[in-house]
């Protein structure tokens, strides 16, 4: 993964102690990194995907002299390995804000693709069409990711996260999976067949479900950045919001239990074989009551385990409700729990059609089932094309038609997304990064940035360190940096 500079924070030390509200409370930083797939159809001769990606990023290179840059909304935009355009959202305090920033990434990628498409047609014919897929597996079977980031308190050991959180992450795919049509049938997740380890610091030699590489992008003595790899890329706004929201509540319960030396209620949920459990969950529709083996020797279904997590979190909320309510600026705990309860009830009843307006895999299953009823002779290749259209944010029509017919719920309006394209969250350090990047671009200054540093490289070198991701107020170093810029 390309870096503008070394963004590790192990060598940095906070000049002031971390505020107790951040360490003792439940506030959190959320972020989503999405890798996109790129393809071209209708060209008069073959076009390499790498060439397409570079054409998309030509305006970025012209402006920033790099394919790796930060934007005025505080996000990061870059080309990942394998010519996959990637967008990493600015730091957000609330799942709803993180969703807005993620949708802003779709908007940015779509605009880059359509501009590149016009240029490509000059050389490859009037029908050359660029497709940008927000999914996780291409037609050749190569997998790429959607990674969630959660700031967690460092006093929680990684072993605790592995044993208590991973079973939740695996089974939450019942309502956050994007679904995938395979030659062997329909799976509710996209990446289960590609993830081979539970936790690891590697991302290329192996494919872990949770990455343990220690890059907190915050005070390293107080926080770690939990880098979740197991999740799918979602088109559904509800699914993106939901996976962040419910994971936050489970993390709060784990952190508080360890903080006070009491049980979280999740201690006995570790899987004997997480990879095997993940593959079983992905094939949920083959046998919704399939049992997963825990380390204790007990067996439980995926839905049964989600019920247990729900009950434990509900009990936790009864004693910590006020503190939890203050942790999220825009999302209520009652809303999260209500949505969680309703989706589990629908899964229990097998009412998958009732989930098609919010759960990606359910929406796609309904589409495939309807197609097979109308055309019993439909081929796998045709269904695969339908699925790709669902995930195509540049020229796809299927997902947009579902939204237009009110068959897919939207949590945010187009105006919300347009605002997030141009503006960072106002209550994290992204506000400062966005302000600096916007000003530097406006005056044509030479600068560099990463998650914790802002640097003016010419005409004079100045740097500001933003170690606290919760802090949106300008530091003295930031004010001096802006003075030098102006």
Swiss-Prot record:
Enzyme class, spelled out: ligase
Domain of life (superkingdom): Bacteria
Catalytic residues identified in the record: 80 (proton acceptor)
Miscellaneous comment as given in the Swiss-Prot or TrEMBL entry: The reaction mechanism probably proceeds via the activation of Pup by phosphorylation of its C-terminal glutamate, which is then subject to nucleophilic attack by the substrate lysine, resulting in an isopeptide bond and the release of phosphate as a good leaving group.
Catalytic activity: ATP + [prokaryotic ubiquitin-like protein]-L-glutamate + [protein]-L-lysine = ADP + phosphate + N(6)-([prokaryotic ubiquitin-like protein]-gamma-L-glutamyl)-[protein]-L-lysine
Keywords for this protein: ATP-binding, Ligase, Magnesium, Metal-binding, Nucleotide-binding, Ubl conjugation pathway
Gene expressing this chain: pafA
Function: Catalyzes the covalent attachment of the prokaryotic ubiquitin-like protein modifier Pup to the proteasomal substrate proteins, thereby targeting them for proteasomal degradation. This tagging system is termed pupylation. The ligation reaction involves the side-chain carboxylate of the C-terminal glutamate of Pup and the side-chain amino group of a substrate lysine.
Protein name per Swiss-Prot or TrEMBL: Pup--protein ligase
């Amino acid at each position: 993964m390309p870096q503008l500079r070394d963004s590790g924070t192990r060598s940095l030390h906070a000049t002031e102690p971390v505020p107790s509200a951040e360490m003792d409370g439940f506030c959190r930083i959320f972020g989503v990194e999405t890798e996109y797939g790129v393809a071209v159809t209708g060209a008069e001769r073959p076009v390499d995907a790498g060439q397409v990606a570079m054409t998309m990023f030509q305006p970025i290179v012209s402006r920033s002299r790099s394919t790796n840059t930060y934007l005025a909304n505080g996000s990061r935009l870059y080309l990942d390995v394998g010519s996959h355009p990637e967008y990493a959202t600015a730091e957000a305090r609330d799942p709803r804000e993180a969703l807005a920033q993620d949708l802003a990434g779709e908007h940015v990628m779509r605009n880059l693709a359509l501009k590149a498409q016009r240029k490509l047609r000059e050389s490859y014919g009037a029908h050359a069409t660029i497709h940008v897929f927000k999914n996780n597996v291409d037609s050749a079977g190569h997998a790429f990711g959607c990674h969630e980031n959660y700031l967690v308190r460092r006093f929680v050991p990684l072993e605790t996260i592995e044993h208590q959180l991973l079973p939740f992450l695996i089974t939450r795919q019942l309502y956050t999976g994007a679904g995938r049509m395979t030659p062997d049938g329909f799976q509710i997740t996209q990446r289960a067949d590609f993830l081979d380890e539970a936790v690891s610091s590697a991302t290329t030699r192996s494919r872990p479900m949770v990455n343990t590489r220690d890059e907190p992008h915050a005070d390293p003595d107080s926080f770690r950045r939990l880098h979740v790899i197991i999740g799918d890329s979602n088109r559904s706004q509800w699914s993106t919001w939901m996976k962040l929201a419910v994971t936050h509540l489970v993390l709060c319960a784990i952190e508080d239990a360890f903080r006070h030396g009491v049980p979280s209620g999740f201690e006995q949920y570790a899987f004997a074989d997480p990879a095997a459990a993940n593959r079983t969950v992905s094939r949920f529709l083959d046998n919704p009551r399939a049992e997963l083996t825990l380390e204790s020797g007990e067996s439980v279904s995926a839905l049964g385990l989600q019920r247990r997590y729900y009950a434990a979190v509900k009990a936790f909320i009864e004693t910590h409700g006020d503190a939890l309510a203050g942790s999220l600026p825009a999302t209520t705990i009652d809303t999260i729990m209500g949505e969680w309860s309703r989706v589990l009830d629908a899964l229990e009843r097998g009412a998958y059609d009732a989930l098609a307006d919010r759960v990606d895999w359910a929406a796609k299953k309904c589409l495939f089932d309807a197609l097979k009823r109308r055309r019993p002779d439909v081929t796998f290749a045709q269904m695969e094309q339908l699925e790709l259209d669902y995930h195509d944010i540049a020229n796809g029509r299927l997902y947009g038609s579902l939204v237009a017919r009110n068959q897919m719920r939207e949590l945010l309006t187009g105006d919300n997304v347009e605002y997030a394209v141009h503006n960072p969250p106002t209550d994290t350090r992204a506000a400062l990064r966005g302000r600096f990047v916007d000003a530097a671009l406006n005056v044509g200054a030479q600068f560099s940035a990463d998650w914790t540093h802002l640097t003016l490289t010419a005409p004079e070198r100045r740097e500001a360190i933003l170690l606290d991701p919760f802090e949106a107020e300008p530091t003295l170093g930031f004010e001096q940096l802006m003075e030098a810029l102006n």
